[in-house]
Amino acid sequence: MPASFAEEALKAQAVAARTYTLYKLISGGNHGDTADICTDSTCCQAYIAPESARANWGENAESYTEKIRTAVAATDGEAILYGGVPILAVFHASSAGLTRAARQVWQNDLPYLKPVDSPEAAESIPNYYSRVEFSPADLKQRLLAKIPGAELSGEKKNWLKNAVRDSAGSVETVEVGGVTVRGTVVRAALGLRSACFEWELQDGNFVFYVTGHGHGVGLSQYGADAMAEAGADYREILTHYYTGVAVAVYSG
């Protein structure tokens, strides 16, 4: 989350990140005996070293560092709880105006990760709408690397078809060369910013139009900032994005 965001958004992010870590510690993570959590954003949580962050912030380094310290200290010990235990507090950069349910992305249904409205100020979000173009040869190579059973020959208009979309407008499933796969598979294969995408053939190439950034589940960082700017505090933000939860000090 950008350190320039509103203080209540930063507090919400601090609690979400803390809760995610607690969840991994309690559940044992998914790295066996080697670690509880990693810094790969596609697996666990992204991390940037303080010195690198300060270099990126330039003249704002001191004020941004203090903002983050304040957000962490103000929420010290607090976590997002469902049934008294920390939740899988996933988050993403920006949604398409409605978040996604966990089952729509990972096929495991979690009661606190349901679709909710998200106030995304598209005009102020970098690359909220993105356009990516692929030649047929490039697209074929990328898709076959992830979907080796796909038959990508014949008319190009039939290479991808029959998309099924969820309530957020993201692609749940799509037929790729005769193989039905989840939209997240195509997103990963093509490096798209989200699974909320449409496509068309344009001058012989495949052009994809993408909305938002990230998996779309849980807290939207830009949505959280919009809520904070509108007057919501961090507890209101968290209980909006995570259904049926409580925000409280967790002693373990």
What are these regions, as identified by a protein language model?
Residues M1-G252:
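Conserved, single-site charged/polar hotspot
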